[in-house]
Regions:
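Cross-family detector of peptidyl-prolyl cis-trans isomerase
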Residues: 1-124
Length: 124
């Protein structure tokens, strides 16, 4: 996995079974303002399927970061971003219950464990 916070990360395909709990790994620890559960965050991120390694979303691919209120995001982000500091890069592995729900929940990614690499660029 690449660790530069200025470039799109590359995620190596994981081995073994997908975790059943949220996994949080700090790749780079930031030294700026800390995200809170009530924050709006400015992030660059990459999302891939745990099972296939296929990319399903990336702000880098769109060419610009995005602002999100954490309260509007999947539970994996709501639980995995607070405590992160601006300038940091964090990997979240979100089981279905903390992503888009069990298979058949009506979202194309339901039933899947998802991996996100997130660069925190700002918080409000």
């Amino acid at each position: 996995m690449t660790t530069s916070n200025n470039t799109k990360p590359e995620i190596d395909a994981p081995e073994g079974p997908a975790p059943s709990e949220l996994e949080i790994v700090d790749i780079t620890v930031g030294d700026g303002d800390e995200a809170q559960a009530s924050s709006t965050v400015n992030v660059h991120y990459l999302g891939v399927s745990y099972d296939t390694g296929a990319e399903f979303d990336s702000s880098w691919s769109r060419g610009e970061p995005i602002n999100f209120p954490l309260s509007n995001l999947i539970r994996g982000w709501q639980e995995g971003i607070p405590g992160m500091k601006v300038g940091g890069r964090r990997k979240l592995i979100c089981p279905p219950a903390l992503a888009y729900g069990p298979a058949g929940s009506g979202h194309p990614l339901s039933g899947q464990t998802l991996i996100f690499v997130i660069d925190l660029l700002g918080v409000k």
